């Protein structure tokens, strides 16, 4: 039979206060989100690309004297169709205009349209969805509206509206925002129905807590990851909408640069002077891809179930 070596043990006094001490670090939701978000290498790479594109798109045009409609050099053959070099990084087109300037002016407009349309749709969708989820009378009406609108392809609605009201910056944003928000509202409504009747919400309602306060304090914080996921899907989608519509002459006016407009204008250069077509297209792909990857990683990180 083995014996216990008493020298390996030490008697200590009982300390009730020490036994109640919590040694685990305090949990911070947003710190955990940031930690999970930056853990992935794809986040760092794509976030770097996205930040660089956004900074150049919004800062460079402030100091450039670029005029998208300038054709004064059309007869100066010495500045036409210059391939990318140290002086003209992206080359020049048939009018002698710098493609570098055109790409960043166009990227700024495309990103602005996407961000503004996304914010408008999210604000309306979350607000209406919150009311939709807690009001049975509103639910009956909105379900009928949703059933009608959801059967029409969103892109078709945008095309019809832009064709009807004409090309323009705010016209395009209006067309993107007329009905798109209803899909977000329906998703918020479904999520609220999941959480509305949980025990702690029933207890709050029994104690007399106002319904709107329950939604704002108890339910909406649970939907952060869902809202972020929706936002990440909308941003690249609206950029693609703008590019598609501008390519067919339905988006921005021909006098306003955008990535879609540049791709449309230089589509005949796919085989000759191909850089005019591929550089704007590559920029569009980089913007959309970086937005999607960064957004998806942020949505995953905002889900508390992924936190450790």
Swiss-Prot record:
High-level lineage: Bacteria, Bacillati, Bacillota, Bacilli, Lactobacillales
Q: Which UniProt keywords apply?
A: Cell membrane, Membrane, Peptide transport, Protein transport, Transmembrane, Transmembrane helix, Transport
- Pfam families with a match to the protein in the record: BPD_transp_1, OppC_N
Q: What is this protein's record name? A: Oligopeptide transport system permease protein AmiD
Q: Which InterPro entries match?
A: BP-dependent_transpt_permease (IPR050366), MetI-like (IPR000515), MetI-like_sf (IPR035906), OppC_N (IPR025966), OppC_permease (IPR054864)
SUPFAM superfamilies of this UniProt entry?
MetI-like
Biological process (GO) annotations?
peptide transport; protein transport; transmembrane transport
Q: Which residues form the ABC transmembrane type-1 domain?
A: 107-295
Q: Where in the cell is it found?
A: Cell membrane
Q: What is its main location?
A: membrane
Give the bilayer topology: Multi-pass membrane protein
Q: Record's PROSITE patterns?
A: ABC_TM1
Q: Which residues form a coiled coil?
A: none
Q: Does the keyword Transmembrane apply?
A: yes
Q: Which GO terms describe its cellular component?
A: plasma membrane
Write out the function statement from the record: Part of the binding-protein-dependent transport system for oligopeptides; probably responsible for the translocation of the substrate across the membrane.
The family annotation for this protein states:
Belongs to the binding-protein-dependent transport system permease family. OppBC subfamily.
